[in-house]
Amino acid sequence: GGRPQGPNGYRSWQGASVGGALCISVRDTAKFVSEMQTIQEAAPYQAKLLDQEKLSALTEPKKRLKIAFSLGSPIDQIPLSESAKNAVKKAVQFLKKQGHEVVEIDFPINARQLILRYYEMNAAETAAMLEPWEKAHQRALNSDDIELLSYALLEAGKKAPVTSYIQALDEWDQTAAIFDEKIWRDYDLFLTPTTAKTAPKIGEPLISDALKKELYALKNYDFKKQMQLIAAAFERSLEFSPYNFISNLTGQPALSLPVYVDDATHLPMGTQLWGKKNSELTMLELALEFENHHQLILPDYYQN
């Protein structure tokens, strides 16, 4: 809603994909939000413009906030690491010290079905994205032309039923309604880990060789089997990052704060602030409170 789109398309992945920025300060994040926000007549998703004066002269929250947090996994059979939990606990301890009301709750949904719907959208959108290339070159793309998962999504997208795609979009909206009912009616913000565990090693295999063979042959299967294989292919990566797609699909703003470092690997672990639509200013104000009290952990060269 708040980011410029077009001119080749205004509903990128039905609103589930939008550009962002990796920033090293809350000031820079607020500046990015301020300068990038816009209203476009052609854009189907609209968000009201935030107050630029408040963004440029950001202050800590002027009132005590009521913040929910959860140490539960959003997806069954995907556990959270102790580092992920410790990052949230550290943030919770700080928030309580600052006088905010912090309440532990269960994660409001089991997002297993939602991620399957997300893959269905990925498949249909990938097919739509690559179809012009196939028409221009008068041939179908094959597994030698593009990366394997993209090829798998392309083949599944060609068989995706229209009804399945519509049902997927409906489920996104129903999930947003659940968040409203279980969180936003009672709390200002929601706090979770950013990821379930620290990042994988560069080059760490996330798809088995046996599964890769199945993906190469994906065009030979029906849509149901195709989606089962695609879900299996994404499962290892989902074990690292089971949160972020949820806010993407529901349209809720989210902000990751680098507050913790894993003792064993010395890799960063973030906590993620979630807010209801148009709550970016509140999120940035709270992020500033973390920053002003030296809770954000940054590399030394950013601090000198």
Name each region found by the language model.
Residues 1-89, 294-303:
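A short helix-breaking turn/cap at a secondary-structure junction
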Residues 21, 267-276, 283-284:
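Short, well-ordered beta-strand elements
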Residues 44-50, 64, 70-73, 105-120, ...:
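Flexible, acidic loop-helix segments that line cofactor/substrate-binding pockets
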Residues 61-70, 124-180, 194-229, 258-260, ...:
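Short helix-loop capping/hinge segments that flank enzyme active sites or metal/cofactor-binding pockets
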Residues 82-107, 130-140, 165, 169-187:
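Acyltransferase
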Residues 163, 283-304:
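Short, gly/Ser/Thr-rich active-site loops of penicillin-recognizing serine hydrolases
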Residues 228-254:
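Alpha-helix-centered segments that form part of catalytic cores
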